[in-house]
């Protein structure tokens, strides 16, 4: 028997012995034993009397969390590690809206301005790592990466907020205005180029979300086959590390 085969057998024996010892120890501890519970992540989670509603052709990333009273329109995309938590009030998102990776959207039941839902219109782009709390963002607006919108803040139609900005409670970005900073202040008027860039970003995300929906809907076997095909293809490339002499 080869050394590799011997270590494989020994490893299996040690692993099984450890599992047996763990189970035995838990039985001996009785009610004091801590047993890890399996946590199966679900994209959509009911809360109280409410369950999320998702429109046709919308993409919800596998590790995104949509909780409670949340309504999402058609062709919108909720990207990886985003959290939409409609537990204490409601969240409404329109059509063709992009909620990027790691964004948190919440609402309020007892905030500084009282109970407030979160409302996000059509064709809105919210950049990665943003926080939207009990705010209103009307259609065709842009929220830059890492921005924060506090309770009662409003972005009117075609309003733009620069990356890394803080829109404080109760503040309003008027239609066609471009704001930025912490706290955010008016910088300039939105240009045709700004509007054109937003349209491109929205369309790119719609197309990209369709590809991600197709890929993330595959079974584990299909995904594994895809990986194997990629590895085989890469091995034939002259610049691949496996084909380069050390």
Curated annotation (Swiss-Prot):
Give each disulfide bond as a residue pair.
Answer: none
Concerning InterPro entries, the annotation shows: Hexapep (IPR001451), LbH_gamma_CA-like (IPR047324), Transf_Hexapept/Carb_Anhydrase (IPR050484), Trimer_LpxA-like_sf (IPR011004)
Q: Which CDD domains match?
A: LbH_gamma_CA_like
Q: What is this protein called?
A: Uncharacterized protein DDB_G0288155
Organism of derivation: Dictyostelium discoideum (Social amoeba)
């Amino acid at each position: 028997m080869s050394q590799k085969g011997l270590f494989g057998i020994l490893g299996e024996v040690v692993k099984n012995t450890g599992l047996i010892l763990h189970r035995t120890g838990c039985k001996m501890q009785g009610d004091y034993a801590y047993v890890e519970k399996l946590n199966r992540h679900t994209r959509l989670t009911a809360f109280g009397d409410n369950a999320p509603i998702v429109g046709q052709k919308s993409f919800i990333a596998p590790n995104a969390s949509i909780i409670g009273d949340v309504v999402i329109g058609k062709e919108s995309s909720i990207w990886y590690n985003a959290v939409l938590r409609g537990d204490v009030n409601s969240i409404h998102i329109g059509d063709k809206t992009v909620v990027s990776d790691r964004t948190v959207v919440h609402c309020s039941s007892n905030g500084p301005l009282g109970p407030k839902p979160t409302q996000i219109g059509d064709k809105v782009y919210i950049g990665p790592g943003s926080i939207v709390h009990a705010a209103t963002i009307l259609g065709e607006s842009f929220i830059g990466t890492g921005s924060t919108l506090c309770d009662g803040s409003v972005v009117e139609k075609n309003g733009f907020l620069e990356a890394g900005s803080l829109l404080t409670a109760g503040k309003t970005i008027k239609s066609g205005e471009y704001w930025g900073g912490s706290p955010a202040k008016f910088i300039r008027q939105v240009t045709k180029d700004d509007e054109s860039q937003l349209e491109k970003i929205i369309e790119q995300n719609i197309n990209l979300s369709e590809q991600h929906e197709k890929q993330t809907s595959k079974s584990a076997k299909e995904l594994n086959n895809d990986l194997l095909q990629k590895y085989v293809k890469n091995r034939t490339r002259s610049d691949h590390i496996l084909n380069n002499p050390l």
